Design a protein with these regions (language model features):
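Conserved acetyl-CoA-binding loop-helix of GNAT-fold acetyltransferases
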Residues: 100-103, 109-122, 145, 149
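Conserved active-site alpha-helix within GNAT-family acetyltransferase domains
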Residues: 114, 126, 138-157
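Conserved beta-strand-loop-alpha-helix junction that forms the acyl-donor binding cleft
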Residues: 108, 134-144, 162
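Active-site rim helix/loop that mediates acceptor-substrate recognition in acyltransferases
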Residues: 35-63, 71
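Conserved acyl-donor/pantetheine-binding loop and adjacent beta-alpha core of acyl/acetyltransferases
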Residues: 69-100
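Conserved GNAT acetyl-CoA-binding A-motif
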Residues: 124-136
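Helix-loop element at the rim of GNAT/NAT acetyltransferase active sites that forms part
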Residues: 23-40
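Conserved N-terminal entry element of GNAT/NAT acetyltransferase domains
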Residues: 1-19, 23, 27
Length: 174
């Protein structure tokens, strides 16, 4: 559905939005057909650390309806930090993950994922991060194209998240 993106609002979200994020994630799975490996199924426990510190959870609203969200996760030295898999990064704490971007099915095709990634990148750059990274399923060309459009390049192919094949993308920003 084509929409007037100028009527949408972007809001920083808090932990209280986790149920809405999970509902939107389930919407993505419901429209995935047989391809359920394209997205990692997050839980409240995997989302909770994404709030606070330098991390950012950014929602896009059409009125009161959450139509998209993006998560920049500054994971520090935890195992969730994708920089552990990047040979070029010597200090993993200088990396932030573009962890998750989901757009409600009816709102796809309006550039929302690309815009969310751009805003997450700008947030990381403003906070002095030197690297950004993200993983994408090889079955998800839309996300790959939106990362590439935001200056990311393919770093390597990995098996992550309990056996899912992922392409690791990275971007040097500072």
């Amino acid at each position: 559905m084509k929409i007037n993106v100028n009527n949408l609002t972007y809001k920083t979200l808090s932990e209280g939005s986790i149920p809405a994020l999970l509902e939107l994630q389930e919407d993505a799975f419901a429209h995935a057909g047989d391809s359920t490996d394209f997205l990692r199924r997050n839980t409240p426990e995997t989302l909770l650390p994404c709030f606070g510190g330098d991390s950012l959870v950014l929602g896009v609203y059409d009125g009161e309806l959450l139509v998209a969200f993006g998560i920049l996760y500054c994971a520090g030295d935890t195992k969730e930090n994708l920089a552990h898999d990047l040979d070029e990064v010597s200090d993993v704490t200088e990396n932030a993950n573009v962890k998750l971007v989901i757009v409600r099915y009816e709102y796809r095709g309006n550039g929302l994922q690309k815009e969310l990634i751009a805003r997450l990148c700008a947030h990381a750059e403003q906070r002095g991060y030197k690297w950004l990274s993200s993983t994408v399923s090889p079955e998800n060309p839309w996300s790959m194209n939106n990362l590439i459009a935001n200056g990311f390049t393919e770093a390597k192919v990995l098996v992550k998240y309990g056996g899912l094949k992922r392409i690791l993308y990275a971007k040097k920003i500072n």
